[in-house]
From Swiss-Prot:
Pathway: Nucleotide-sugar biosynthesis; UDP-N-acetyl-alpha-D-glucosamine biosynthesis; N-acetyl-alpha-D-glucosamine 1-phosphate from alpha-D-glucosamine 6-phosphate (route II): step 2/2; Nucleotide-sugar biosynthesis; UDP-N-acetyl-alpha-D-glucosamine biosynthesis; UDP-N-acetyl-alpha-D-glucosamine from N-acetyl-alpha-D-glucosamine 1-phosphate: step 1/1; Bacterial outer membrane biogenesis; LPS lipid A biosynthesis. This is Bifunctional protein GlmU. The active site is at H373. Signal peptide: none annotated. Its main location: cytoplasm. The lineage of its organism: Bacteria, Bacillati, Actinomycetota, Actinomycetes, Mycobacteriales. GO terms for biological process: cell morphogenesis; cell wall organization; lipid A biosynthetic process; peptidoglycan biosynthetic process; regulation of cell shape; UDP-N-acetylglucosamine biosynthetic process. GO terms for cellular component: cytoplasm; membrane. Keywords: Acyltransferase, Cell shape, Cell wall biogenesis/degradation, Cytoplasm, Magnesium, Metal-binding, Multifunctional enzyme, Nucleotidyltransferase, Peptidoglycan synthesis, Repeat, Transferase. The keyword Metal-binding applies. CDD domains: GT2_GlmU_N_bac (cd02540), LbH_GlmU_C (cd03353). Residues 449-487 are annotated as: Disordered. Its EC number is 2.7.7.23, 2.3.1.157. Mg(2+) binds at D113, N238.
């Protein structure tokens, strides 16, 4: 495909989107971990345009900062033009063109609520537009059921004679299955001139961009249409139902891309993959798994089932089962889960383990270190090849401030150990079960706490008479006495 040159793009994002019934501006709703407007701008930026303009209007206090953030993400300058009063698509393009006062090349106009459009399709539109020497080129699509869409009518030479809306179409015209998508390529000079001739003499009292086609034809210019290969790319989003439908279509695209890249996805219907996720080869993803943000899954890892990872780096060969994790790193060949909660700032070393019902936060765990089960570990550093016993708690919060715990390498702690931070446990140290560690433990030492166990005989029967426990104790004592008598 030829390189795109002398091109600008205008993305329309000024509408109110009332059918979304939301305090969030329509184009800022997300699918695949990216806003609708973000998807549209990524597609337009794929043209490498000389100028990229977003027309903002309704709730621009929300949209403008979002545009700035997307511009930074794309590393691409994005201008903003304001449509103070939403007076139709033609008026919106007038506002966008005001940001391009000296530009007369090809102007691509697309919409901020069409998230599935690929850059390749826009490049094909540009190529058809310039290759056919059109003044206007409509990006059209062929639908099995075109009801509700404006029909694209063509002359014998293939040029477009008109776009007729459903309500204005004759019975014969309604049989046409090629329809307008609302995406166009314009000759900049022709567009600039035609916009001055638009009028609002219509039922809505608005300026329509589709009227530019008739104005261009009357001026003797050629109007053409390029049929998109996949109509699903041009699915617009106007309400929550369409938002969900577009999300499913995008996710199917992401899942199929992953499988073609060498990933086994056991159940594509219950697997969700965001657009910024990277997955290696020979990865296995089990059902009910969601991967979001900048999550990366290295070769040979296994994720799921019932797992949600957001901004997580998973190393090669690691296993992550029934885990919710955020903003953390899991080393190669590490084992995570089941029922593990990884909060931001966790680094699990190679061959490390966070087991069942473990919650970790802002913690670095060394190579081969295991936290097997029923443990909270937060604000801690643990060295290599240590083992934290079951039901241990890193007591990091004093009610005002968080404090750090440092555990050395080759440490073995007994079950139900409490680490009262700030505290340090040296290399090779041990702790007994039930130990409360309030002071530093030297390397190689055994830490124990609590006095000798004391049993108060008969306490239950004296203090809790008549209870099932007292009755059970009495029976046991009687049985013991009978055994002694018999013997």
């Amino acid at each position: 495909m030829a390189e795109v040159t002398n091109c600008a793009a205008i993305v329309l994002a000024a509408g109110a989107g009332t059918r979304m019934k939301s305090s969030t501006q329509k184009t800022l709703h997300e699918i695949g971990g990216r806003s609708l407007l973000g998807h549209a701008l990524h597609a337009a930026a794929g043209l490498n345009p000389e100028h990229l303009v977003v027309v903002v209007g309704h709730q621009r206090d929300q949209v403008s900062p979002a545009v700035d953030a997307i511009s930074e993400e794309l590393d691409c300058a994005v201008s903003q033009a304001v449509q103070e009063e939403q007076n139709g698509t033609g008026h919106a393009v007038q506002c966008g063109l005001s940001a391009l006062p000296e530009f007369d090349g090809t102007v691509i106009v697309t919409n901020g609520d069409v998230p599935l459009l690929r850059p390749e399709t826009l490049r094909q539109l540009h190529e058809a537009h310039t290759g056919e020497a059109n003044a206007v080129t409509v990006l059209s699509m062929t639908l099995e059921d075109p009801t509700g869409y404006g029909r694209v009518l063509r002359a014998d030479d293939g040029s477009v004679t008109a776009i007729v809306e459903q309500k204005d179409a004759s019975e014969e015209q309604r049989k046409v299955r090629e329809v307008n998508s609302g995406v166009f390529a314009f000759d900049g000079a022709v567009l600039r001139d035609a916009l001055t001739k638009l009028n609002s003499d219509n039922a809505q009292g608005e300026l329509y961009i589709t009227d530019v086609l008739e104005i261009a034809r009357e001026a003797g210019h050629r109007v053409g249409a390029h049929v998109a290969a996949d109509p699903e790319e041009l699915s617009g989003v106007n309400d929550r139902v369409q938002l969900a439908a577009a999300g499913r279509l995008l996710n199917r695209r992401m899942v199929e891309e992953a499988m073609r890249g060498g990933t086994t996805i056991v159940d594509p219907d219950t697997t969700w993959i965001g657009v910024n996720v990277t997955i290696g080869q020979d990865v296995v993803i089990h059902p009910n798994t969601q991967l979001w943000g900048a999550t990366t899954i290295a070769d040979g890892a296994e994720v799921g089932p019932d797992t949600t990872l957001t901004n997580i780096q998973v190393g090669a060969g690691a296993s992550v089962v029934r885990t919710h994790g955020f903003d953390s790193v899991i080393g190669s060949n590490a084992q995570i889960g089941p029922f593990t909660y990884i909060r931001p700032g966790v680094i699990v070393g190679e061959e490390g383990k966070l087991g069942g019902f473990v919650e970790a936060k802002k913690t670095q765990i060394g190579r081969g270190t295991k936290v097997p089960h029923l443990t909270y570990i937060g604000d801690a550093t643990v060295g290599d090849y240590s083992n934290i016993g079951a039901s241990s708690v890193f007591v990091n919060y004093d009610g005002v401030n968080k404090h750090h715990t440092t555990i050395g390498s080759h440490v073995r702690t007994g079950s139900d150990t409490m680490f009262i931070a700030p505290v340090t446990v040296g290399d090779g140290a041990y702790s007994g079960a039930g130990t409360v560690i309030k002071d530093d433990v030297p390397p190689g030492a055994l830490a124990v706490s609590g006095g000798k166990q004391r049993n108060i005989e008969g306490w239950v029967q004296k203090k809790r008479p008549g209870t099932p426990a007292a009755e059970a104790a009495g029976k046991a004592q009687d049985a013991k006495a009978n055994d002694q008598t018999t013997n």
